[in-house]
């Protein structure tokens, strides 16, 4: 027996029903009946449609709010102290699995102590963290913030 000899057991596979393809069963209306919403293409009610009454989501009161504040991925000084590298950027922190979410900015916090010189490239840092890193002989590199005044001066 070879691969090309293999065939499914008779009766185990059913042919697909081809509807709307000439007389002989499911021709004109293709099994949808006559007229009405369910006979039209793209027809169907929404998942939460309740026959015209107010949807459950509309009956329940609004609650809470969407916080517009920035949520940071936090990196602590104590975490950097135990690692071998001397330069840390987003890629390095992701490799060490200190930063998990790629869409959030990274912030360095002064939790714990650092006793060696490191260079840290982050989006934000607390004043105490910057002070601690610089006291150990390292530096914290933050992105330059562009203001409208800077843009106006460059245009001149």
From Swiss-Prot:
<dbReference type="GO" id="GO:0019843">
    <property type="term" value="F:rRNA binding"/>
</dbReference>
<dbReference type="InterPro" id="IPR001196">
    <property type="entry name" value="Ribosomal_uL15_CS"/>
</dbReference>
<dbReference type="InterPro" id="IPR030878">
    <property type="entry name" value="Ribosomal_uL15"/>
</dbReference>
<dbReference type="GO" id="GO:0006412">
    <property type="term" value="P:translation"/>
</dbReference>
<protein>
    <recommendedName>
        <fullName>Large ribosomal subunit protein uL15</fullName>
    </recommendedName>
</protein>
<keyword id="KW-0689">Ribosomal protein</keyword>
<dbReference type="GO" id="GO:0022625">
    <property type="term" value="C:cytosolic large ribosomal subunit"/>
</dbReference>
<dbReference type="Pfam" id="PF00828">
    <property type="entry name" value="Ribosomal_L27A"/>
</dbReference>
<dbReference type="InterPro" id="IPR005749">
    <property type="entry name" value="Ribosomal_uL15_bac-type"/>
</dbReference>
<dbReference type="InterPro" id="IPR036227">
    <property type="entry name" value="Ribosomal_uL15/eL18_sf"/>
</dbReference>
<dbReference type="InterPro" id="IPR021131">
    <property type="entry name" value="Ribosomal_uL15/eL18"/>
</dbReference>
<comment type="subunit">
    <text>Part of the 50S ribosomal subunit. Contacts proteins L4, L21 and L35.</text>
</comment>
<keyword id="KW-0687">Ribonucleoprotein</keyword>
<comment type="function">
    <text>Binds to the 23S rRNA.</text>
</comment>
<dbReference type="GO" id="GO:0003735">
    <property type="term" value="F:structural constituent of ribosome"/>
</dbReference>
<feature type="region of interest" description="Disordered">
    <location>
        <begin position="1"/>
        <end position="48"/>
    </location>
</feature>
<keyword id="KW-0699">rRNA-binding</keyword>
<keyword id="KW-0694">RNA-binding</keyword>
<comment type="similarity">
    <text>Belongs to the universal ribosomal protein uL15 family.</text>
</comment>
